[in-house]
């Protein structure tokens, strides 16, 4: 995961200090891209331990189209609690936009079902896109989408994915996003009969919060280790049929967790 360490180093050396919505302050750069070959191992950070359970359940929650944290809490995942209202609702966030984008004529568009179908029918299409950024709904969301658009690409029997992330909390959020979209790419590849290719991560405002700088410097002192392997149950043939038990992360040997506060 040298790509991630290079990003940390670039922000620490070149970042501009900026004010932000949370009042915490950031060091920020604009425009950065990382590429991960999924055949070379699953891109899960090894220089600090990440919670696989939270990553997988959040992705399954998105794919269910849910926008209430009830499912997450039932599975011991609290990463969205800070933004939920008293009833656990978040407004029309990722799951709603992915699975039930409201069309002007009253229809509901299932972008995930559509893109999986299109990969099978028209793999060379340049329209294999899912967007979570709906300007009509942004003001209704507890937190507008940070990872807001992704595109699939098929070549030589392999499925690749590029994510555009408008706002990237590099210490806490980006490691989750890398693993989540790498896993999504593997899942979609399996159900469309393809092999995983690359995950390409394009960042807009990539920032370290000022209260994460010491943690980032600590992480950079740790040598990277071999990437783990992600095994997915080959019997699952629908993108909506995956369960937590269908994923097995093997040979994950990370350095210890590094605690940092979430900027809300």
From Swiss-Prot:
Major location category of this protein: cytoplasm
GO molecular function, one term: thymidylate synthase activity
Reaction(s) this enzyme catalyzes, per UniProt: dUMP + (6R)-5,10-methylene-5,6,7,8-tetrahydrofolate = 7,8-dihydrofolate + dTMP
Binding site for (6R)-5,10-methylene-5,6,7,8-tetrahydrofolate: 169, 263
Enzyme Commission number(s) from the entry: 2.1.1.45
Pfam family, one: Thymidylat_synt
Purpose of the protein: Catalyzes the reductive methylation of 2'-deoxyuridine-5'-monophosphate (dUMP) to 2'-deoxythymidine-5'-monophosphate (dTMP) while utilizing 5,10-methylenetetrahydrofolate (mTHF) as the methyl donor and reductant in the reaction, yielding dihydrofolate (DHF) as a by-product. This enzymatic reaction provides an intracellular de novo source of dTMP, an essential precursor for DNA biosynthesis.
Similarity comment: family membership: Belongs to the thymidylate synthase family. Bacterial-type ThyA subfamily.
Protein name per the record: Thymidylate synthase
Gene that this polypeptide is encoded by: thyA
